[in-house]
């Protein structure tokens, strides 16, 4: 179900049926009992008009109740949060004109009902013993936790390799920024790795949602690996984006997210999205300079408004590096104590970045 993970609605559906939830327990009971079921996750006027027969319950949801109600013919209607059983043994009559790619009666009804109501609809196949979820015009099949964990562990190993390479190119960029030797290629390489890490981490986050209580360890490993990758991505873009365009940061981040896998390995394409390297983005060896957001963010206890004020005042990282304590105090919000802290912080960062590169 990895295609769900970038979609907030899909993520919510995954969490609703993840292991450890009452709904998942009920679905597994239905499978073990070798019966089928049709379950609507939501209720409004559209669903009410679609329902025929059955009876109104409006009782608290439980896995055992779901299992017993599934023994009867007809669909079960739950509230959106799957906390109450609203109706049972109803016949769903969705619009027959709605297209469906399914062949079985239960699955055809589920797909049409999901499209017509906008609510997720779950179909449990009695013969094939599978659970299918229909939502937003798509279909997903629930899998066993072991199969999901196997894919998740492979993705986690890939993330570890990506993160290791990201740390390397990020450290190199820091040293080059200190020496004022940054090229478009260096920036594009870091952005490329940041986007690759972001994408694989989003996929793993989807597995965490899908695994529910079985994904706790995976979630801890993911949090430890990605750390501050999200803020780092925005800081790198901010350092090399056109400061005169208010929407430039969001435009670049959105453009990077739209790149397909083939374009993402092409540094020229990445440079084009960032507006670097000339009109065609192919001048990868042309020199560029950072504004200083990323380097200043590494100084402890330096608030974001002060970082923004310093970047606006000096314009480039090189001017900050050459600024004295007195020069730093000219920035709004920077007193003598903070100026000395920034001056010492920049000096330590410059020294450590160069040491990491050459040692």
UniProtKB/Swiss-Prot annotation:
Coiled coil spans: none
Cofactor(s) essential for the protein: Mg(2+)
Superkingdom of origin organism: Bacteria
Pfam family membership, one: DisA-linker
GO MF entry, a single one: DNA binding
Broadest EC class assigned to this enzyme: transferase
Domain DAC, chain residue ranges per copy: 7-145
Record-listed ATP binding positions: 74, 92, 105-109
Function: Participates in a DNA-damage check-point. DisA forms globular foci that rapidly scan along the chromosomes searching for lesions. Also has diadenylate cyclase activity, catalyzing the condensation of 2 ATP molecules into cyclic di-AMP (c-di-AMP). c-di-AMP likely acts as a signaling molecule that may couple DNA integrity with a cellular process.
Family: Belongs to the DisA family.
Subunit structure: Homooctamer.
Name this polypeptide is given: DNA integrity scanning protein DisA
Annotated organism of origin: Beutenbergia cavernae (strain ATCC BAA-8 / DSM 12333 / CCUG 43141 / JCM 11478 / NBRC 16432 / NCIMB 13614 / HKI 0122)
